[in-house]
Amino acid sequence: MDLHQLLKYRLTGANVVYEIPTENNLQNSPWQANPLKYEFSDSPYTPLSSQFECDNLSALTNTPDNQSSTETISAQPISPLEADSSYRQAGILLQENIQVGADPLYATSRHNMQHALREIETVLMAPDTDDATTSTKHEFEEIKPAQLVRQRSRTWSHESRQPLPGVGRSQFASGGYPTASYEFRPEKRQRELREDPQIIVKQLLTRCAEALSEDRTEEFHKLVQEARGVVSINGEPIQRLGAYLLEGLVARHGNSGTNIYRALKCREPESKELLSYMRILYNICPYFKFGYMAANGAIAEALRTENNIHIIDFQIAQGTQWITLIQALAARPGGPPRVRITGIDDPVSEYARGEGLDIVGKMLKSMSEEFKIPLEFTPLSVYATQVTKEMLEIRPGEALSVNFTLQLHHTPDESVDVNNPRDGLLRMVKGLSPKVTTLVEQESHTNTTPFLMRFGETMEYYSAMFESIDANLPRDNKERISVEQHCLAKDIVNIIACEGKDRVERHELLGKWKSRLTMAGFRPYPLSSYVNSVIRKLLACYSDKYTLDEKDGAMLLGWRSRKLISASAWH
């Protein structure tokens, strides 16, 4: 059996139908969530300098309209030309009270200056109305936009107002303003702020996380109530994700994250129902499908001449990864090999699914009979960290393959347990001398990062995941809601609400996995370029927003600019 045969069964053997979905016109917000605080400071690059020059301050009046802002704006001349007598004669002092010169010429441009001030208020995230608002403790740190507007330095200081829902300091995470396409159109900008749930939800949730991390309990409760009004399991991707993130924050505040996570696991649907949800996720989220595809391609290539194969699958779940590989092995020109699969699943997951590993065994037995391939299934209900060589019963003459698919991040590392079970497991596997070891993992770093950084990373990662689901399944589809609740929500809650040994969702980036595997004695086994080319073509059938990158023999699958899944092989 060669890779072409394996991929043939990947495409046709499992009755997989590829349809080009209607692209969902999701807008990518220029504002990114970030838990850091920002303060407006002395920046020569602020766009205010081009819109609010001292020599353009023709007139201001001391009317209620012009005193509606509670912000303090100070214009300080930095050159002799700007400090000349004509500038001083204007008597303009932009402090708590606005004073103007008595020259009647200034009154003629009152309307223009009112418009200029409204533009400035828009940039500073002021509310829609002209009514004075209460200042908050939030401050902006120095921000420099990507595009240089004016080289002349100005100092603009202010205390930020209580922002609109989702409009605050955190939206400046990218360190700048929109680029050249940005226009000073107050009405349009305010409408965009009101209508874009990306801005509203992300900023509200970030403020909730900040208040929680700083023990500002009263503010946290108020923000939670505000956030509940803009999240929904039926809304935009960020609104759906926000519903689960918010529950994670509430659970963390109540120290109930662990109980909620365990309850979610115990409330998993029955085996057949969960298997159905996982298959839906498998079909609408090609990351998992093509992660399996890459791993199976590496296994097929490494074992192509072997007649006695033993696959050890840590966290076998529903066993769907092996359907197409078994079909391909059964079609070998010289006859199928003997296949033995050891499926490992932790007792909690097995209990939650009812029949547990039995249903996986029944499925594999049915496939064995249908495709006439000698197949033996050995269930092993034990935590991965407790697996020993003796449990695996390695037999002489077996060509061994070990598979870690979205599982290894569940194993604690040195930050949780001084014995470092994660690296210990890899060393144990290396001691088995497998012909190939495959690893598929989420491309995220939620392992040792502090809470606020972890919250921002989780929101960014799953935002891309939820957006990609929208590209392939209608938003009002009831199955989509069930898939997100049963397959994704519990992971999100665990990352946000739990700590210590109770936080089992501890993702790491490919670079970190590479370091761990190398220290355990593994060497990279480059994935087939043919497999990668086929995956690249199939991704295009879903959406042109999917990406595939090859790095050091590994494969990275993503949505837009966000990498979501890594697949690699080792020996």
UniProtKB/Swiss-Prot annotation:
Its main location: nucleus. GO terms for biological process: regulation of DNA-templated transcription. Residues 400-494 are annotated as: PFYRE. Residues 278-343 are annotated as: VHIID. The keyword Transcription regulation applies. A motif (VHIID) lies at residues 309-313. Keywords: Nucleus, Transcription, Transcription regulation. Residues 359-391 are annotated as: Leucine repeat II (LRII). It comes from the Eukaryota. Induction: By oligosaccharide elicitor (N-Acetylchitooligosaccharide) extracted from the rice blast fungus (M.grisea) cell wall. Strongest induction by chitin oligomer with greater degree of polymerization (heptamer). By inoculation of M.grisea in rice cell suspension culture. Pfam families: GRAS. Residues 61-80, 151-180 are annotated as: Disordered. It is found in: Nucleus. Residues 192-571 form the GRAS domain. Residues 199-259 are annotated as: Leucine repeat I (LRI). Residues 497-571 are annotated as: SAW. One of its GO terms (cellular component) is nucleus. GO terms for molecular function: DNA-binding transcription factor activity; sequence-specific DNA binding. Residues 61-77 have a biased composition (Polar residues). PANTHER family: OSJNBA0084A10.13 PROTEIN-RELATED. Induction by oligosaccharide elicitor is independent of de novo protein synthesis. May play a regulatory role in the early step of oligosaccharide elicitor response, downstream of the membrane-associated high-affinity chitin-binding protein. Belongs to the GRAS family. This is Chitin-inducible gibberellin-responsive protein 1. It comes from Oryza sativa subsp. japonica (Rice). The lineage of its organism: Eukaryota, Viridiplantae, Streptophyta, Embryophyta, Tracheophyta.
